[in-house]
Amino acid sequence: MDREERKTINQGQEDEMEIYGYNLSRWKLAIVSLGVICSGGFLLLLLYWMPEWRVKATCVRAAIKDCEVVLLRTTDEFKMWFCAKIRVLSLETYPVSSPKSMSNKLSNGHAVCLIENPTEENRHRISKYSQTESQQIRYFTHHSVKYFWNDTIHNFDFLKGLDEGVSCTSIYEKHSAGLTKGMHAYRKLLYGVNEIAVKVPSVFKLLIKEVLNPFYIFQLFSVILWSTDEYYYYALAIVVMSIVSIVSSLYSIRKQYVMLHDMVATHSTVRVSVCRVNEEIEEIFSTDLVPGDVMVIPLNGTIMPCDAVLINGTCIVNESMLTGESVPVTKTNLPNPSVDVKGIGDELYNPETHKRHTLFCGTTVIQTRFYTGELVKAIVVRTGFSTSKGQLVRSILYPKPTDFKLYRDAYLFLLCLVAVAGIGFIYTIINSILNEVQVGVIIIESLDIITITVPPALPAAMTAGIVYAQRRLKKIGIFCISPQRINICGQLNLVCFDKTGTLTEDGLDLWGIQRVENARFLSPEENVCNEMLVKSQFVACMATCHSLTKIEGVLSGDPLDLKMFEAIGWILEEATEEETALHNRIMPTVVRPPKQLLPESTPAGNQEMELFELPATYEIGIVRQFPFSSALQRMSVVARVLGDRKMDAYMKGAPEAIAGLCKPETVPVDFQNVLEDFTKQGFRVIALAHRKLESKLTWHKVQNISRDAIENNMDFMGLIIMQNKLKQETPAVLEDLHKANIRTVMVTGDSMLTAVSVARDCGMILPQDKVIIAEALPPKDGKVAKINWHYADSLTQCSHPSAIDPEAIPVKLVHDSLEDLQMTRYHFAMNGKSFSVILEHFQDLVPKLMLHGTVFARMAPDQKTQLIEALQNVDYFVGMCGDGANDCGALKRAHGGISLSELEASVASPFTSKTPSISCVPNLIREGRAALITSFCVFKFMALYSIIQYFSVTLLYSILSNLGDFQFLFIDLAIILVVVFTMSLNPAWKELVAQRPPSGLISGALLFSVLSQIIICIGFQSLGFFWVKQQPWYEVWHPKSDACNTTGSGFWNSSHVDNETELDEHNIQNYENTTVFFISSFQYLIVAIAFSKGKPFRQPCYKNYFFVFSVIFLYIFILFIMLYPVASVDQVLQIVCVPYQWRVTMLIIVLVNAFVSITVEESVDRWGKCCLPWALGCRKKTPKAKYMYLAQELLVDPEWPPKPQTTTEAKALVKENGSCQIITIT
């Protein structure tokens, strides 16, 4: 297509699409209508299945600006097509019609968002999105998102709220007053109703959609064909099967819609209060909210109906619906830069960056804290499907297709079957013409061969193994919302684990503290709860610097904060709503020690105790809280001791981050050594700091001060040492994964040294393995980005505490020769900042680091997702196991994401384990491997079933015969369906093995297995077909034939003394038919046994009792009616009587067939991989997986791994391949 006629929307995002414009063509529409009539409606079906064909067949290309229909194509590997109709939104209905008065309602720039003020510069902006004469805006809707035409960028763009391009200053200055009713009405016209509409389709609509599936259309075609040929019984059986399948599918689909609808309907129609510009409070429905509305958060809490940024007060929020984390989160108001001591006026508001100040849609506000007369307010920033919950629901409603080689190969194999059917189709026509068969019979029989080759039961058979695996997973507490992922889990060869709560216990135990006095560490202390420390600043920090709250009288919050607070034994008291309402200011949360801990003596005259001048009651009020930020790695509070004039600032967080914000002279010289000693033992270390604030800081000023103004120039107070024990099962599970050649990677928000220590303790890194730390620094002061390579085991102290970088890893440079490094295993470790720098500036190093990267510390949620993608880019099948809190994106992105949660199902993860243990990972992989092998077995069996039956019919067509109606029925229902659904019941093998199942159907061993069985079955079937004609008793069968009585005892043939039957119009009853029917019936069972694989991925087939019973029963039944014919059975199956000696001969043919088939299949299993390439003269091929190919390259690369005391610098002008150079430091 012409490049000028193509645009790209959502550029650089996951849902990036190309867009083409079209206008409806009347003459094309007329031609298509004629084609639909001539094709009997088939063309209409084809156009329904193929949206791009439908648009191109009925429309002509047009400029995108003026088009009536848009054709969309995703730019990912799937290249999926969608079409949407252009609609026009008229602005004439808006009460204020002047374009100038509307200039502040629409946005500018490359993202369609709200304009902040109606300046002269913005007055023309409405013309970008509307025709100035008619005041109309053109838009289309795709996947619940509206895209509006933007004249500035000459493209469609989606409408945004206040979540992008709006500064924090603007939030307060231009949006905190609320909207007028006119502005509200106008924005509602653009944004529409604030709802996440998951409409449950009617049963009729779902039925039509399901019935129009290509598979069911093919079945309908088959049924009509069979009915025409008077194969009524088999046609009826297929109809019954189809009805059962459709009803089951409809029930399942509708149930999922209802569940999703119920999940999102909780906030759909709640009443909310909003503030208008004249300070009027108006009560409206939540569906009427628009970005810019100022919403009042009720005192008793609510379920948030939108995304909103908090500008007044504090909220306690449960975000478990979005994150899976049940611990309540404290949300504080967004800092107001205009009143900050140290402003951040240039900072743009972002819901992710400022998530501690953002209330997300669907989350539950449990409690609020407020000023009297100053309600708890939040400004609506996103509504409907643009909210965080809306985006989550969209990802469920419109999932990305699963890219798995098995499914691609399955479609390819179906095409092969269609090609085989085409050959049979042509052969049947030619053969029938040569034998002067009637035209009607030729058409029916030639079409019939197609329905035989492509079996109608194939889709149901393929899903059987997955359904059984899902049931087995549910029994062991693993719930699945994406069954197709089970097969993919069978291919996992790398698993990422979160640390806290996943590899280690959720709870932390306080091991002890190590205080600092006069810039020196004191000896570690285990008992914090004693009289000597009760009024120290250290304990005051532990008592106040947390986000704990009481919910229904129970102390709740982060487990680390709970352990820390419980260790000192203090009491936390929160003001009630009534108490707060009696004061002119917010009532703070108060903490105080129990009476028995307070010293009875009067305060000493030392500097420490002069702060406490009211010995009667010693209480500390928490005035302001700056919540913990994973990006900043710290939290802080402003507190005041009762009776003291000055306030105190307390801070806690990652030791490196805290030390970097403290006065250098207060940080001990041996800080790094002490920190290293603890972290290398796997302790979680938290640093504390304190600062006395100026007396001029009033209560109200503190409420609006920025955290940067507080968190600086602190006094370092010491360390809290928490013990985070490994879960009991962790080492054993990781050892099982390593034995199975499955790589394990740690992705954590904890510190580097702690993560490396835990990795060694749990066996992820073996004692003899090297750990190379990649410390990447971004470009700075004209210098290019660089990576410093260090070794984790050679840490030393930093001689200049003042130069401590919060993210720097102090490492002693190693001068030793490391020539033996290639002979030892090595692992890369890095933190989140280094990972981001490497992704941006060292793209060619990313695959190499992914090959041996084992520890990724201080990783933010989005960085975890980027890591999963980087691993997938080198062809790893990646699993992710986490607690669901910060891992939602990574869990969804991984091939197999499993969340450890008490909930039965989490929308954030394909799999959810009710048992909070990583033992679910090997269980999931085992079941995935079993399901994958089952899929292979079933597919191979169904392929052989098609070819065997296809060849049987082709042989019989050569003599103008066919299989009978009940013969088809017996084979397809009694044999095939029973075998398929029972052979899928094999449970998973009891342990993981190093061998992995193949990922696709197109592999040498698998193809050889199928082709060899096809040849064997065709050979023995042909042998029986042609050999029977050579028998001395053979003749063209007719009702008076008496071959049964020519030889053998009358006992065997007594049931066939009377062969008088009605005329056989279809020539079903003959010796060739009987021979082919018996031999082929046994062949289905033979290949079922041959293909029913057991160890090492499934339990042996003899432990599948239903399968064994079914096969034995069918064998006995077929053998019985072959050797001991029953007249009634033979009459129904249209079998003719043959001499007993021929029955024995057929039995011998079947036994030899079974021996050859099973022997060949066992040989392929045992020696196929090693012998087939040699036998075919194939040289060793380059590994298909990128990571395997890369590993071979790195084995002969003398520059890899990087040696210690070296630096990798990015070139000043980075080329497209991200080339870099190695510079050795001397």
From Swiss-Prot:
Instruction: Please name the gene that encodes this protein.
Output: ATP13A3
The record lists the organism as Homo sapiens (Human)
**Residue ranges, Lumenal side:** 227-232, 431-448, 962, 1021-1073, 1127-1143
In the record, what disease is this protein associated with? Pulmonary hypertension, primary, 5: A form of primary pulmonary hypertension, a disease defined by plexiform lesions of proliferating endothelial cells in pulmonary arterioles. The lesions lead to elevated pulmonary arterial pression, right ventricular failure, and death. Primary pulmonary hypertension exhibits incomplete penetrance, sex bias and variable age of onset, both within and between families. PPH5 is an autosomal recessive form characterized by the onset in infancy. Death in early childhood is common.
The broad enzyme category this protein falls into is translocase
Tell me which residues bind Mg(2+): D498, T500, D883, D887
Localization, UniProt? Recycling endosome membrane; Early endosome membrane; Late endosome membrane
- Kindly list the biological process annotations in GO that this record carries: intracellular calcium ion homeostasis; polyamine transmembrane transport
Keywords (alphabetical) are:
ATP-binding, Endosome, Magnesium, Membrane, Metal-binding, Nucleotide-binding, Phosphoprotein, Translocase, Transmembrane, Transmembrane helix
In the record, which positions carry Phosphoserine? Answer: S98, S817
What lineage is on file?
Eukaryota, Metazoa, Chordata, Craniata, Vertebrata
Show which residues sit on the Cytoplasmic side of the membrane: 1-28, 50-205, 254-409, 470-940, 984-999, 1095-1105, 1165-1226
Cross-referenced Pfam families, in alphabetical order?
Cation_ATPase (PF13246), Cation_ATPase_N (PF00690), E1-E2_ATPase (PF00122), P5-ATPase (PF12409)
Q: Which parts of the chain span the membrane according to its record?
A: 206-226, 233-253, 410-430, 449-469, 941-961, 963-983, 1000-1020, 1074-1094, 1106-1126, 1144-1164
The record's similarity note reads: Belongs to the cation transport ATPase (P-type) (TC 3.A.3) family. Type V subfamily.
Q: Which residues lie within the membrane without crossing it?
A: 29-49
This chain's protein is named Polyamine-transporting ATPase 13A3
This protein's source sits in the domain of life called Eukaryota
Q: Identify the catalytic residues.
A: D498 (4-aspartylphosphate intermediate)
